[in-house]
A protein has these predicted regions:
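Classical eukaryotic N-terminal signal peptides for Sec-dependent ER targeting/secretion
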Residues: 1-63, 71-76
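Exposed, interaction-prone regions of secreted/extracellular proteins
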Residues: 54-496
Length: 496
C-alpha cells in the first residue's frame, strides 16, 4: 500500500510538471506574438512588461529542466491533454528510477507491469524469462540464458585496438545509465518517455512510428524484384548488404552481426542515421510486410540529442498501423533488467583511434515461435509470435547496413552522415563496418553467410557506399568472416 501511494504521488508530480512546462511554452508563445503588435497603450505595455517579468523565471526553469531546443510551436490545451494521457499509458510506476548522465531517466518497472504486455493479441500472455533453446554453431554455445537474464558478466561492447586480423580485446559493455545504478531482479529497464519527446513528434497518434512507406520505387524493375523494403522513393537512402529471397535459398530463422558504433552528424532536426539488421518476410510491394529490426541510431527528433542509441522496431503491415520503436507501443516483451532499449551507448569509435562495436542476434525460438533479441551476451526480450503473419513461420530475407533520410534541405543533398561519415574505401578505423555476418537455419544453428550469398545496394554511391569482403580466419573465430565497410558524408562535390 505504501509503495502504491508513493508511485501515485510520483506520477502526480510528473503530471503537474509536464503541464507546467507545456503551459509555460504556450504562454511564452502568446507573449512573443504580442510583442509584434504596435497598437498597445503605454499602460498595456507596462502590464505586458510585468507579465514578462513574471514569466521569465518559469521560462528559465523550463529550459534548465528540459535542456532541449525551443519548439517552433506552442501546444494547444487539447494536444497537451492528449500528450499527458499518452504518457500515463506508457510510463508505468517504477520500483526504482535511475537518472543518467545523458539526461535520461531509466525506470525499473515490474516485468509484469510493462507496457509491452498491453497489446490485445497478448491478453493473458505469460512472460518467457528465457528461450527454451538458443542458437548453436559447432563447439560454440550461446552464454547460459539464465545467467544472461540475471544480468551477470555482460560484455556487450567489443574494443578493437589494431586491425581486423588480430584478436580483439574484450571490454565490459556499458549503456550510459549504468553509471547511475542498476535495476533489481524482477524488473525491466525502461527509458522514460517525456513530454518533450512527444512535443518533438509530428503527431501523438504516430509518435514512435516510422513514416508510412511510399510504394514508388527508386530502382529499376529488375532490381526491385529482389529489392528490400527499404528501397523506396520516400527520401531514405541506404548502403546495405542483403540475402537473396528464400526462393533461392533455405528459409531463415534469425541473423547476427557485430556492428561498429559511431556518432554520425545529423544536419536536420528531423533527420536520422542508423545502422541495423532487418529480419523480413512478406510482400515488399504490398501492405503485409513483416519486419523485425535492431541496431543503433542517432535521431534528434526521437531522443532529443545526437547520441547513438540501441533501438528496435517491428511491423506486421509494412509500417502502416502496427509496431513502433523500442517500447513506445505494446508488443515487444522485455526481460532484461540490465539493458534499456532506447538508451545511449558509450563509448563510441573515433577516427584512427579505438574502435567499438556491439553484437546483435535475433532468432526464432523453434519451440514457442517467439523472436528473441540478444545484445552481446545479454538477453533483452522477445517479439511474441502472435504479432506477425509471415514471420510467425520464418523470414525470407535478411539485411544489414545503414540508412539516412534525405529531405534535401535548401534544395541540396543532406550532409547527414552514415556510419562514421567516411566512405567504405577508407577501411578500418575510418569507415564503419559490419562483421561476422551469420544467419540461423531450421536446425537453430548459426551459419556464416558466404560472401557470394549476399548482394549489396547503395542508391547513390557518390553520397554513401558499401564494399563487401571476406576474412578466411573467420572459421577460427578470430577473424571477421563475411563483412563490409559502408557509409559516407552525404553532401559533397560529387553528391550535390
Amino acid at each position: 500500500m505504501q509503495q502504491h501511494t508513493a508511485d501515485s504521488s510520483r506520477k502526480k508530480k510528473r503530471r503537474r510538471r509536464n503541464w507546467l512546462l507545456l503551459s509555460t511554452r504556450s504562454a511564452a508563445q502568446e507573449e512573443g506574438q504580442g510583442e509584434g503588435q504596435c497598437c498597445c497603450s503605454q499602460s498595456q505595455s507596462q502590464s505586458q512588461g510585468h507579465k514578462l517579468m513574471i514569466m521569465s523565471p518559469l521560462l528559465v526553469l523550463a529550459l534548465l529542466i528540459l535542456a532541449a531546443p525551443p519548439l517552433a510551436f506552442a501546444a494547444s490545451p487539447r494536444r497537451m491533454a492528449r500528450i499527458q494521457s499518452h504518457l500515463d499509458r506508457i510510463n508505468k510506476p517504477a520500483v526504482r528510477s535511475i537518472r543518467s548522465a545523458d539526461g535520461d531517466t531509466i525506470d525499473c518497472v515490474a516485468a509484469q507491469s510493462q507496457h509491452g504486455l498491453e497489446h490485445p493479441l497478448l491478453e493473458g500472455h505469460a512472460i518467457q524469462t528465457e528461450p527454451p533453446e538458443v542458437p548453436r554453431r559447432g563447439a560454440f554455445r550461446f552464454p547460459a540464458a539464465a545467467a544472461a537474464a540475471a544480468g551477470g558478466g555482460a560484455t556487450n561492447l567489443t574494443k578493437t585496438t589494431t586491425n581486423s586480423n588480430n584478436n580483439n580485446e574484450r571490454l565490459g559493455a556499458w549503456q550510459t545509465w549504468h553509471h547511475g545504478g542498476h535495476c533489481p531482479r524482477g524488473t525491466v529497464a525502461i527509458r522514460r518517455t517525456t513530454a518533450e519527446d512527444m512535443l518533438r513528434a509530428r503527431s501523438v497518434a504516430r509518435f514512435g512510428r516510422k513514416k508510412k512507406k511510399n510504394s514508388k520505387r527508386s530502382v529499376d524493375a529488375a532490381r526491385a524484384a529482389n529489392a528490400p523494403d527499404v528501397v523506396s522513393g520516400n527520401g531514405h537512402e541506404h548502403a546495405i548488404a542483403y540475402t537473396a529471397p528464400s526462393s533461392q535459398q533455405q528459409p531463415v530463422y534469425g541473423a547476427k552481426a557485430t556492428i561498429n558504433v559511431w556518432d554520425p552528424a545529423i544536419q536536420e532536426s528531423n533527420g536520422f542515421s542508423l545502422s541495423q539488421l532487418w529480419i523480413l518476410s512478406g510482400s515488399f510491394n504490398g501492405s503485409d510486410l513483416n519486419s523485425i529490426e535492431a541496431g543503433w541510431q542517432v535521431s534528434p527528433e526521437l531522443y532529443g540529442d545526437s547520441r547513438p542509441r540501441l533501438f528496435t522496431y517491428w511491423t506486421s503491415d509494412a509500417y502502416e498501423a502496427t509496431g513502433c520503436y523500442n517500447a513506445l507501443c505494446p508488443g515487444f516483451v522485455q526481460t532484461s533488467s540490465r539493458i534499456a532499449i532506447g538508451a545511449s551507448i558509450s563509448p563510441v569509435s573515433s577516427p584512427g583511434g579505438a574502435q567499438y562495436d556491439m553484437t546483435l542476434l535475433v532468432w526464432k525460438d523453434p519451440k514457442l515461435g517467439n523472436w528473441w533479441l540478444s545484445y552481446g551476451d545479454q538477453l533483452v526480450g522477445y517479439w511474441p509470435a502472435q504479432l506477425f503473419t509471415h514471420l510467425s513461420d520464418h523470414a525470407t530475407m535478411v539485411e544489414w547496413g545503414g540508412e539516412v533520410v534525405d529531405t534535401r534541405p535548401a534544395g541540396v543533398h543532406t550532409a547527414t552522415q552514415m556510419g562514421s561519415g567516411r566512405f567504405a574505401a577508407e577501411g578500418f578505423a575510418r569507415a564503419s563496418y559490419f562483421r561476422n555476418l551469420e544467419t540461423v537455419d531450421a536446425d537453430n544453428s548459426l551459419a556464416e553467410v558466404p560472401l557470394d550469398a549476399i548482394q549489396t545496394l547503395a542508391e547513390n554511391a557518390a553520397c554513401y557506399d558499401i564494399r563487401k569482403a571476406y576474412d578466411d580466419a573467420g572459421h577460427s573465430g578470430a577473424g571477421w568472416g563475411t563483412h563490409f565497410y559502408y557509409g559516407g558524408p552525404g553532401h559533397n562535390p560529387a553528391c550535390p
